[in-house]
Swiss-Prot record:
Protein name (database record): 1-(5-phosphoribosyl)-5-[(5-phosphoribosylamino)methylideneamino] imidazole-4-carboxamide isomerase
Organism whose genome encodes this protein: Dehalococcoides mccartyi (strain ATCC BAA-2266 / KCTC 15142 / 195) (Dehalococcoides ethenogenes (strain 195))
GO biological process: L-histidine biosynthetic process; L-tryptophan biosynthetic process
A Pfam family that the UniProt record links to this protein: His_biosynth
Catalyses which reaction(s): 1-(5-phospho-beta-D-ribosyl)-5-[(5-phospho-beta-D-ribosylamino)methylideneamino]imidazole-4-carboxamide = 5-[(5-phospho-1-deoxy-D-ribulos-1-ylimino)methylamino]-1-(5-phospho-beta-D-ribosyl)imidazole-4-carboxamide
Residues of the active site: D8 (proton acceptor), D129 (proton donor)
Keywords from the UniProt entry: Amino-acid biosynthesis, Cytoplasm, Histidine biosynthesis, Isomerase
UniProt similarity note: Belongs to the HisA/HisF family.
Length: 237
């Protein structure tokens, strides 16, 4: 199972939010590129980079920083946040990004997801970001009545080959992942699923591996030191 460190960028800095709330940010580093190199040096197989400004604004805001991370890293970099056009997808992939993550556009413009997958299926993941089983969009600010499992099923039909599942209520809380929801998603679509939100211990990672998650995104716990990343790589990767 891939254990994927998260680097969330807001205002050019590496931050963590509590439950996706932009008013509750903690700055962990003024240097996202240096942070990326640190996680790589500990053995990360991949990096998960989120442009939080982009997620809120609907377009790539921290593009130059993201390109620098992608070009500096020797490991694959996946990027989400504000990717809502074919041009942005092309721009990121051309800049060296390995995988683009689509969120809002999956709800608001599924036809575009179909077009993106027709060209770049192996370089796409759709992020299912849920609050009480319902999908949230636009940097998790906008709540919808779209059911998380139904969205995943419809995206699979459009050619999506990989999913990320985030339980927003657990993100940044150091509580635990929503194991039941992740298990339900894996069994519903029978596709690779990467778990996110609340992953904060080795036992969480072992459980996610046991229920069949392809990977786990680790955020706040590696910045606070609650999760020893090097040990996690040694034991589970």
């Amino acid at each position: 199972m891939e254990i994927i460190p998260a680097i969330d960028i807001l205002g050019g800095r590496c931050v963590r939010l509590l439950q996706g709330d932009y008013a509750q940010e903690t700055v962990y580093s003024p240097d996202p590129v240096g942070t990326a190199m640190r996680w790589q040096s500990l053995g990360a197989p991949r990096l998960h980079v989120v442009d939080l400004d982009g997620a809120a604004d609907g377009e790539s805001v921290n593009f130059e920083l993201i390109r620098e991370i992608a070009n500096s890293a020797l490991i694959p970099v996946e990027v989400g946040g504000g990717i809502r056009s074919m041009d942005t997808v092309k721009k990121l992939l051309t800049a060296g990004v390995d995988r683009v993550i689509l969120g809002t556009v999956a709800v608001e413009n599924p036809e575009l997801v179909r077009e993106i997958c027709a060209r770049y299926a192996d370089s796409v993941a759709v992020s299912i970001d849920a609050r009480n089983g319902k999908v949230a969009t636009r940097g998790w600010v906008n709540s919808t009545e779209v059911d998380a499992l139904e969205l995943a099923r419809s995206m699979k039909k459009l050619g999506v080959k990989r999913f990320i599942y985030t339980d927003i209520s657990r993100d940044g809380t150091l509580s635990e992942p929503n194991f039941a929801a992740i298990r339900d998603l894996i069994s519903a679509i029978n596709m690779p699923v990467i778990a996110s939100g609340g992953v904060s211990s080795l036992s969480h990672l072992r459980l996610l591996k046991d229920i069949g998650a392809e990977g786990a995104i680790v955020g706040k716990a590696i910045y606070t030191g609650d999760l020893n990343l090097k040990r996690a790589f040694e034991e589970l990767s």
